[in-house]
A protein has these predicted regions:
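General nucleic-acid-binding
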Residues: 1-15
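Short, Lys/Arg-enriched anionic-surface-contact patches
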Residues: 22-42
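Short, amphipathic alpha-helical "recognition" segments used to contact nucleic acids or chromatin
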Residues: 40-52
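Short helix-capping/linker segments at secondary-structure and domain boundaries
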Residues: 52-59, 79
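Eukaryotic endosomal/vacuolar membrane-trafficking regulators centered on PX-domain-mediated PI3P pathways
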Residues: 55, 87-89
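Short alpha-helical "recognition helix" segments of helix-turn-helix
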Residues: 57-62, 69
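Short, solvent-exposed alpha-helical "recognition" segments
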Residues: 73-87
Length: 89
């Protein structure tokens, strides 16, 4: 199985989970606590940006670095994933 196939398999596994408890159990096994915290911080920063907060406001309300915030901002502007955050709430 190629690396792209393994990545696709991971996406399919996550998509097949039924609730947040199952997702939490999988992420607890797959990721370190710090990796989960970093993903959560990126999602929070994306949400703040989508709500109209400035970089300075986001940095004041989160523990994200300016470099990571810049990447999150690009993904919010041009990507498709972060837009799901506000749709789910």
């Amino acid at each position: 199985m190629t690396q792209p196939d393994r990545i696709q398999q991971l996406y399919q596994i996550i998509a097949s989970l039924e609730d947040a408890d199952q997702v939490r159990a999988l992420f607890d096994d797959l990721c370190t606590v710090k990796e989960i915290e970093n993903m959560a911080e990126r999602c929070y920063a994306a949400k703040l940006l989508m709500e109209g907060n400035t970089y300075n406001q986001v940095m004041a309300q989160s523990d994200i670095s300016s470099a990571t915030l810049s990447r999150v901002s690009r993904c919010v502007q041009y990507g498709k994933g972060y837009s799901q955050l506000l749709k789910k709430e």
